[in-house]
């Protein structure tokens, strides 16, 4: 059994779609990044790679590689799944938290969960996604960015 921890953060900017968990969420700003900047999926990828001692997403999908420009993070997550499976690991469970003042994530969590479970070929009870605010504190509380944490267990 191996545990992995992932974290990601991206700045909110105008003229970008807000994509979290593979879901495009209506909002006046989106996340800035080389790929689609999906903080939730990025945190999950780092947790999985960390648990398997395979580095991080920057190692496998560098932002200097134009092939990853605006790519769907779900496609990258599928590649991470293949990497950990190749090493003989299977996902036992994943638990995640999205930290955002706005927009409210509650209404999108089921769709996020469906996307990620489909991508990783997980049963619904193997993935948990929560959302919280920081009550107006810090960069997420001031709506300057969104972050996500993920922890996973591999066997």
From Swiss-Prot:
4-CDP-2-C-methyl-D-erythritol 2-phosphate binds at residues 8-10, 34-35, 56-58, 61-65, 100-106, 132-135, 139, 142. It comes from the Bacteria. Its cofactor is a divalent metal cation. GO terms for molecular function: 2-C-methyl-D-erythritol 2,4-cyclodiphosphate synthase activity; metal ion binding. SUPFAM superfamilies: IpsF-like. The record marks 34, 133 as: Transition state stabilizer. It holds the Pfam family YgbB. Binds 1 divalent metal cation per subunit. Its EC number is 4.6.1.12. Disulfide bonds: none annotated. It catalyses: 4-CDP-2-C-methyl-D-erythritol 2-phosphate = 2-C-methyl-D-erythritol 2,4-cyclic diphosphate + CMP. A divalent metal cation binds at residues 8, 10, 42. GO terms for biological process: isopentenyl diphosphate biosynthetic process, methylerythritol 4-phosphate pathway; terpenoid biosynthetic process. CDD domains: MECDP_synthase. InterPro entries: MECDP_synthase (IPR003526), MECDP_synthase_CS (IPR020555), MECDP_synthase_sf (IPR036571). Keywords: Isoprene biosynthesis, Lyase, Metal-binding. Pathway: Isoprenoid biosynthesis; isopentenyl diphosphate biosynthesis via DXP pathway; isopentenyl diphosphate from 1-deoxy-D-xylulose 5-phosphate: step 4/6. Belongs to the IspF family. PANTHER family: 2-C-METHYL-D-ERYTHRITOL 2,4-CYCLODIPHOSPHATE SYNTHASE, CHLOROPLASTIC. Homotrimer. Involved in the biosynthesis of isopentenyl diphosphate (IPP) and dimethylallyl diphosphate (DMAPP), two major building blocks of isoprenoid compounds. Catalyzes the conversion of 4-diphosphocytidyl-2-C-methyl-D-erythritol 2-phosphate (CDP-ME2P) to 2-C-methyl-D-erythritol 2,4-cyclodiphosphate (ME-CPP) with a corresponding release of cytidine 5-monophosphate (CMP). This is 2-C-methyl-D-erythritol 2,4-cyclodiphosphate synthase. The gene is ispF.
